């Protein structure tokens, strides 16, 4: 009897509601099934080649089978879209991609395409390649643009918006750009200059920024004022504190007697006057030769 009741109770249980499968999972599953279909087709072609052809032509027939199966399943490249570049650079990128229309979509490896572009096209930065299934390839990139002049090992270089040197660019043609000096200064420049943009009372008067110890900056303004910043993680806070100090006292004014602001300790600023500046100039690694390109 106990077994009968158990079955009766089981019969009264409500069926579990079906779970809704997210669209992203369905898309991944469809891609997996499609890849399985292509692979299965390739295996059949390989067997046929082994049975009826020479060993030398097996690989060619396998590849042909993959392409034919992908095409019949609708997985071919029909469009390559390039965004973020000027027309001339777009043409260079398209040539570097080297993927004809109607090619097997599975062959369009985003990592390989990215490597081709970066190796062949000099004037690009921040390259991303995406496959939009089943037929489109999207290439997103930026034209490299000069951001700053960087002096390293006694030589000036032009660096782009991500801090990479732009070989072939003449620094003499970019004398209006901000200047940074010191080891790894070029690579750290984009972050500093982005932070300084929020403080035009400093950025518009920046003469040179010196990288110190690979972790912080000293700034020299065209008025002669020098600002020692803390480590990179605290630069935003330090610049805001300097701004507040200027609002209260006018330390950044051209006729200010302040010649140095030590903002390395956010709890207590040190302000230098007169002779303090001369002492600092003598110890600074920025000399007259590094002040011009």
Curated annotation (Swiss-Prot):
Domain POTRA intervals: 75-144
Topological category with respect to the lipid bilayer: Single-pass type II membrane protein
GO CC terms in record: cell division site; plasma membrane
Family recorded in the similarity comment: Belongs to the FtsQ/DivIB family. FtsQ subfamily.
Stated role: Essential cell division protein.
Gene3D superfamilies reported in the protein's UniProt record: Cell division protein FtsQ/DivIB (3.40.50.11690), membrane protein fhac (3.10.20.310)
Protein's GO biological process: cell septum assembly; FtsZ-dependent cytokinesis
Protein name as it appears in the record: Cell division protein FtsQ
Keywords: Cell cycle, Cell division, Cell inner membrane, Cell membrane, Membrane, Transmembrane, Transmembrane helix
Cytoplasmic-facing ranges: 1-29
TM stretches of this protein: 30-52
The keyword Cell division belongs to this UniProt entry's keyword annotation: yes
Keyword Cell inner membrane: yes
Residues exposed to the Periplasmic side: 53-293
Alphabetized PANTHER family for the sequence: CELL DIVISION PROTEIN FTSQ (PTHR35851:SF1)
Pfam families in the cross-refs: FtsQ_DivIB_C, POTRA_1
Subcellular localization: Cell inner membrane
